[in-house]
């Protein structure tokens, strides 16, 4: 039996996860994408196929504070807080967390914990 690469394992988990995780207007989906250098998160209404709000480490608001954010848990928690604040301003308190096939550990967990601390419920 051949071993799948880490990227293929992540894609396989993501496809399996997306069958059950669907966001709507009352409870949209908080989707997370993690690359080697950056982390991206967005709140999506799947029924209308619209992105309600988003945040990432390449966000203009975060770039003004420092030129380059490191790819670590601290920058992920900053993104989580920023996303939660933007979602609450738009009137969203509850979301469904979509980890995007990534393991719930490290940068993904830091983003989720920071979003919870900032007021999002999931």
Swiss-Prot record:
Q: What is this protein called?
A: Large ribosomal subunit protein uL18
Renumbered to this chain, the Basic residues biased-composition regions fall at 1-19
> HAMAP family recorded for this chain?
Ribosomal_uL18_B (MF_01337_B)
* SUPFAM superfamilies associated with the record: Translational machinery components
Q: How does it assemble?
A: Part of the 50S ribosomal subunit; part of the 5S rRNA/L5/L18/L25 subcomplex. Contacts the 5S and 23S rRNAs.
Q: Which PANTHER family match?
A: 39S RIBOSOMAL PROTEIN L18, MITOCHONDRIAL, LARGE RIBOSOMAL SUBUNIT PROTEIN UL18M
In UniProt terms, what function does this protein have? This is one of the proteins that bind and probably mediate the attachment of the 5S RNA into the large ribosomal subunit, where it forms part of the central protuberance.
- Known Gene3D superfamilies for this protein? 3.30.420.100
Q: Where is this region: Disordered?
A: 1-21
For this UniProt record, give its keywords in alphabetical order, as a comma-separated list: Ribonucleoprotein, Ribosomal protein, RNA-binding, rRNA-binding
């Amino acid at each position: 039996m051949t071993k799948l690469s880490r990227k293929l394992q992540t894609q396989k988990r993501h496809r399996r996860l997306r069958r059950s995780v669907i966001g709507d207007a009352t409870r949209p989906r908080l989707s997370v994408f993690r690359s080697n250098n950056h982390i991206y998160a967005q709140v999506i209404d799947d029924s209308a196929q619209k992105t309600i709000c988003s945040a990432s480490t390449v966000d203009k608001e975060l770039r003004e504070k420092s030129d380059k954010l490191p790819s670590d848990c601290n920058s992920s928690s900053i993104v989580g807080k920023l996303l939660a604040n933007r979602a609450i301003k738009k009137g969203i308190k509850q979301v469904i967390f979509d980890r995007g096939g990534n393991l719930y550990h490290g940068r993904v967990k830091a983003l989720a914990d920071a979003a919870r601390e900032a007021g999002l419920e999931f």
